Amino acid sequence: MAIAKRKARSAPKSKGAAKAAAVKSKRRRLPYYNQTTDFSCGAASLLMAMRGLDKEIPFDRVHELQVWREANTVYMGAGHAGSSPYGIALAAWRRGFHAEIWVSHKGAVLLDYQKKPEWRKAGKLMQEADEASVRELGMPVEKRSWDVADLAQARAEGAVPIVLVSTKAFHGDNTPHWVVFADSDETRVYINDPWISRNKGQTAKFQTGRAATHAAFMNMAKYGPRNERAVVLIRGPQI
């Protein structure tokens, strides 16, 4: 054991190699924003994505609620409406960003979560209108399967993925929720989750870059009996 230690010290890495290794291993952190209501996770996630791409983006409650007001086309059946991928994409575009949407099926999402028939109809109508606007603006909407490698590639190319998940794994209930895919490595993904379950001892620091295995993340990144999946890739300010 002593010989092994002496050998390790006798051949240190160069400063350049050590610096490169440190840079490679350092996860890319995104600024964290804690949603201020129980229905503005989509808006809070978009604020984190935009702020990560442009430090001039306002990072406050007024902006959060402005974004929520624009994107709230998923009627939850109780309480206030939440954000659809199409509403998030349009809110990003209005602020100079480009978005791309991946969905597991065509048309409106999370209709199964809407309990009242009239709210289901309203949500479907508004999402269809927003989807048409997204397509007219040239933002891609793609029905596709995806995995962690696809999100990691998009992140490496400069996009920030906002992902639909269930709250069951992180918070114990089972509600549709938006989070930010901040980074990943060979075994884990790192998520900025805008919701903080303070009764579980969670803090903003705990929910910033929160780790999950690839398998756990893929299991949580779906919702409802149809296993609906949705991702909104936010890309840098439009030139």
PLM regions: where:
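Internal catalytic-core helix/loop-beta-alpha segment
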Residues: 127-169
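Active-site-adjacent structural segments surrounding the nucleophilic cysteine of cysteine proteases
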Residues: 1-121, 125-132, 144-145, 187-189, ...
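Noncatalytic regulatory segments and standalone regulatory/sensor domains
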Residues: 2-4, 8-9, 155-156, 160-162, ...
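Hydrophobic transmembrane alpha-helix bundles
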Residues: 95-109, 137-149, 199-211
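Generic secondary-structure transition motif, activating predominantly at the C-termini of alpha-helices
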Residues: 68-76, 96, 138, 152-155, ...
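Short amphipathic alpha-helical segments and helix-helix/interface helices
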Residues: 88-89, 148-153, 179
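Residue-level detector of functional hotspots within protein domains
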Residues: 25-27, 32, 137, 147-149, ...
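Generic structural motif recognizing short loop/turn segments at the entrances and edges of beta-strands
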Residues: 23-30, 63, 95-98, 139, ...
